[in-house]
Curated annotation (Swiss-Prot):
tRNA (mnm(5)s(2)U34)-methyltransferase as annotated region, ranges: 1-236
Protein name according to UniProt: tRNA 5-methylaminomethyl-2-thiouridine biosynthesis bifunctional protein MnmC
Region of interest (FAD-dependent cmnm(5)s(2)U34 oxidoreductase), residue spans: 262-654
Lineage, highest ranks first: Bacteria, Pseudomonadati, Pseudomonadota, Gammaproteobacteria, Pseudomonadales
Source species: Pseudomonas entomophila (strain L48)
Signal peptide: none
Highest taxon in the source lineage: Bacteria
């Protein structure tokens, strides 16, 4: 899979229409574009009627080949907003090999002033668009857009979804034959269910025959404007085979949409928000006096992407999560809650320099840029020991502000001083107890308390590890305010938030005491010297008394493979019995349903990447729970799945 981003190369004609250089074709007709969209895609998929017939909590899923300027999406959203009942949702999934730059998208949107109420919200979030899955939450969560950036034949096989209606809107088959292949139509069939509809402007014979062969019943219908005929289709083939049972979707929960989330840090707050936006009434149980009191409580955390040049599942998760978090931060107050000041990772030795060279070759400059020594100093505003890799869209975040913002939804109720000691399942309800007192109950519960999820028997065998980390708070000086970006080596230092810089962070695998220590403050000052002796001088570090420094310590919670643990939870003993045959033959996939603990989910193990992976993991939990398209590639969802560890133990005979 390509990790290089290629934007659409566009020329604008004398009527203001965008014209693709890559495909030598126009994106839409200047006078008939919206009318064509309504006729070809809205009418052929009966969306007026289907939107009006939705019930509260129903979600209609549209799939599209070729996002282009987004016109089809905006027209569908406008109609959904007009016709759908309150509480219904629209989920729009689209693939685009050459996304428009933000400037080109804004220019195209000016051609449709009647759609401004829908184009502007997307434009405000149109940041950090990089290869892979990029999810947008719009209209208070009523509308979800999942853009898959890349070649359709690379992206669609990774999608886990059930599509209700298809918009086939690549450029004309003669101009863009790769978008009209039997292999692609096989993917459309895999993602469809019996009754899924399809609309397309092309009536080319081989396209029609290939769609019929894939399982669609196709019919030519009268067109509009210069298009004499268009096509309407219905999927009449068989439903796709389900995933391996240990990664299959749990059955829908009966009863009211009520949920408990245990823990109000980054993972819990994100999960609560994602469920609340889908109509769940969420009670967040937090043992402390307020949210973000543990690892999520640092004054500044860094939006830092530790990527691989080889497109690993972790790298894909980071890239998708980074984009989702950046779009969320657009709602917060820049300078106080976060700052997109960029992140500079120094090339502090030859090995790191070689790693950075590979990354610079693998990714687009909009994501990361290799800077020489003098360039790095110009970006940072201080003297440095080396150049490095600059992430212009990165920066720092005040994690408690993000948690508070995510909890600020009318469907979320925060219950502080509620420590859950035990979970009991009674009559389809998960009951949260603090000993003798019943705190709350609901059909769905999400454990989001970092390593403390292991106190519950269902998660006791998850291999979570706590790593103590301490940050140091340094008073800003007039000279230190020259620092313009986060700078990282083995540690990191951020530009000041208010009157303080944050410096960190130590790694201690053996200490369980959260009292800040002088030794670790001294260690952090040593990390600062490695980053920049100039900044250490500007901060007056030589005169600072380490015993008087302020800071805080907390536990990172990580897994052995450094991926978070996100998804539905199974009964481990029953799992081991049900799939015992895997110890003898790991290749077989028995047709035996997974013994889920219905309604129990976990969101943990984010390590030092919580700002990047936790918000998107909230969306992943909600997608599992609501039967929606997964916001990450299927392989990434499986790599994050709680069952991966029990599966490995069975296969390895441990």
């Amino acid at each position: 899979m390509s990790t290089l981003l290629q934007h659409a190369q566009i020329d604008w004609d004398d009527q203001g229409r965008p014209h693709s250089r890559q495909y030598d074709d126009v994106y839409f007709a200047i006078n008939e574009g919206i009318d064509e969209t309504l006729h070809v895609f809205i009418e052929q998929n009966q969306l007026r009627q289907r939107f009006a017939e939705l019930k509260p909590h129903d979600c209609l899923v549209i799939g599209e080949t070729g996002f282009g300027t987004g016109m089809n999406f905006f027209c569908a959203w406008q109609l959904f907003a007009e016709l759908a009942p309150a509480g219904a949702r629209l989920h729009f999934v689209s693939v685009e090999k050459y996304p428009l730059s933000r400037d080109d998208l804004a220019r195209a949107m000016q051609l449709w002033p009647e759609l401004a109420a829908f184009t502007q919200p997307l434009l405000e979030q149109y940041v950090a668009i990089h290869p892979g899955f990029q999810q947008f939450s719009l209209d208070g969560g009523q509308v979800t857009l999942n853009l898959m950036i890349g070649d359709a034949l690379e992206q669609l096989p990774q999608l886990d979804a059930r599509i209700d209606a298809w918009f086939l809107d690549g450029f004309a088959p003669a101009k863009n034959p790769d978008m009209w292949t039997p292999e692609l139509f096989t993917q459309l069939a895999r993602l469809s269910r019996p009754g899924t509809t399809l609309g397309t402007f092309t009536t080319t014979g081989w396209v029609r025959r290939s769609l019929i062969e894939a399982g669609f019943t196709m019919k030519k219908v009268p067109g509009i404007g210069k298009k004499w005929e268009v096509m309407h289709g219905v999927y009449t083939g068989a439903a796709a085979a389900p995933a391996a049972p240990w990664y299959a979707r749990p059955t829908d929960l009966p009863g009211p949409r009520e949920a408990l989330v245990i823990g109000a840090g980054l993972a819990g707050s994100a999960t609560a928000r994602s469920l609340a936006e889908r109509g769940w009434q969420v009670s967040v149980l937090e043992r402390h006096a307020g949210p973000a009191q543990e690892a999520s409580g640092n004054p500044q955390g860094v939006l830092y992407l530790k990527l691989s040049a080889h497109g690993t599942t972790l790298s894909q998760m980071i890239l998708s999560g980074f984009g989702y978090t950046r779009r969320w931060l657009e709602h917060l107050q820049r300078g106080q809650d976060w700052d997109a000041c960029g992140v500079l990772q120094l090339a502090f030795d030859d090995q790191e320099a070689a790693r950075q060279a590979k990354l610079a070759a693998a990714f687009d400059e909009s994501l990361l840029q290799r800077l020489e020594h003098d360039q790095a100093e110009a970006v940072a505003g201080i003297a440095l020991a080396s150049g490095g890799l600059f992430y212009p869209e990165g920066g720092w975040v005040h994690p408690p502000a993000l948690c508070q913002a995510q909890l600020g939804h009318p469907n979320v109720r925060l219950l502080n001083h509620h420590e859950v000691i035990e979970l009991r399942k009674v009559d389809g309800q998960w009951q949260a107890w603090d000993g003798e007192r019943l705190l709350a109950s609901a059909p769905l519960v999400v454990l989001a308390g970092a390593a403390d999820v292991r106190r519950f028997p269902a998660c006791a065998e998850l291999p979570l590890k706590r790593i103590r980390g301490q940050i140091t708070r340094l008073p800003a000086t007039e000279a230190s305010r020259a620092l313009r970006t986060v700078v990282c080596a083995d540690g990191y230092v951020a530009p000041p938030r208010g009157d303080e810089h944050t410096l960190g962070a130590s790694f201690d695998f053996h200490n369980d005491d959260l009292t800040p220590t002088t030794a670790e403050h001294q260690g952090n000052l040593g990390l600062l010297e490695d980053i920049s002796t100039d900044l250490a001088t500007r901060l007056g570090c030589a005169e600072l008394d380490a015993e008087q420094l302020e800071g805080r310590a907390a536990f990172r919670c990580t897994s052995p493979d450094y991926l978070p643990i996100v998804g539905p939870v199974a009964d481990v003993q029953a799992f081991n019995t049900t799939y015992a045959m895997l110890a003898k033959d790991a290749r077989q996939v028995p047709d035996i349903a997974c013994p889920w603990l219905d309604g129990l989910y976990v969101n943990s193990g984010h390590g030092s990447r919580g700002l990047i992976t936790a918000p998107l993991s909230g969306e992943l939990i909600a997608a599992w729970a609501c039967g929606e398209p997964l916001p990450v590639p299927r392989a990434v969802a499986e790599a994050c799945h709680p069952n991966r560890f029990a599966l490995r133990r069975l296969i390895r005979g441990k």
